[in-house]
C-alpha cells in the first residue's frame, strides 16, 4: 500500500516548518495522517509514504504525528540526491561567521551583529531545531538559507528589494541542483550534474529547463512508479487541486483509492478528473453527505465508504469510569443556520440528560463563534 498525501503549503509543493513562536492556524492532521497512523499501529500490511512536497523538516513532522518510523520516499530527496536518512543536530555555532560576530538573544530569534550592523537572524522550529537563517546587507534581507533537519543546508533563496528572485535547491554537499525562478515559475537544472536519484541509482533529467515545478516532479515521480512499483500495488491518493492533473496522468491504469477530506472535495468540469473518479477502485470520504456529491459528479454509483478521521472506538475501561456523557461535534463545515438549530437541539437534550457535555471541535485557530454560542 502506498500513500500519496497532500501535505502542501497553500498551492505550492512545499511544507516548511513553522516558527516556534507562531500560533498554528491550520492543523497538520488530515485523512492521510489518520490512515498512516492506523497502518502504523496495527501492522495491517506493508505501506510507504510517497511525499511529493519539499519538506526539509519531514522527520519532525512524522514525529509529531507519532509515525516517526514510517517508511517514506521523498521526491525532493530524489531530485537533490539526498542519501541521508537520520536526523542530525546542526547548531548555528557550526556555521561560518565573520570575525567579531556578536549574538543577541531575543524572545523570537537570535540576531547576529557584525560591527554593530545586523548581519543575520537565526530562526527555530517548534522542536528548537534551527530551520532558517536570514542574511542582511545594510539592514535589507538579501538571502534566506533553509536547513534540513538531517543537518545540512537544503535551499538558499536570493532576495532583491525584499522580494524573492530565485531559489536554489542544493545537494548534501552544498552544490546547487536546480534553480527555481519566482517570476514565471520556470526551472533550470545544473548542467554539470543533471541527475536525480531513485533507489541509489542515478537517472538523467529529460531536459535542463522546465516550465514549472509540477512538470519536474511529474517526471521524477513517474520514474519512481515505473521502477519501484508494480501494477498490482494499491495507491491511496489524497485528492488535492494542486496535483489533480498529475494523478490523472500517472494513475490511470493503476489500483487506486481516492481520499476526499473536508474542503478538498473540489469537483470541477474536467474530463480526466471525472474519469479518474469513475474508474477508481474505492473512494473514501469523511462524511456521508459527500457521497451524493461524488456520485452526482461521476454520474454513476461509486464504491464509497465514509470513514471519520476521529478514533471512534469505545474504550470501555475508561468509559465506565466517566460520570458524564461527552459529545464531540465537528463544526467547521456547519452553516450558521444549521449551527443554530444544533444549539437548540442540544438545549432540549440537556433538559433530559444532565450528565451530557458537548465539545465543539474546530481546526480553525481563528474560530469566532464563541460569543454567538454563549449569548444564544
What residues fall within each predicted segment?
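Repetitive, compositionally biased segments used for assembly/scaffolding
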Residues: 92-213
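Active-site proximal beta-strand in glycosyltransferases
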Residues: 235-241, 247-265
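Short beta-strand->alpha-helix junction loop in the catalytic core
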Residues: 262-264, 289-290, 303-317
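Conserved catalytic-core segment of nucleotide-activated headgroup transferases in glycan assembly
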Residues: 284, 288, 312-372
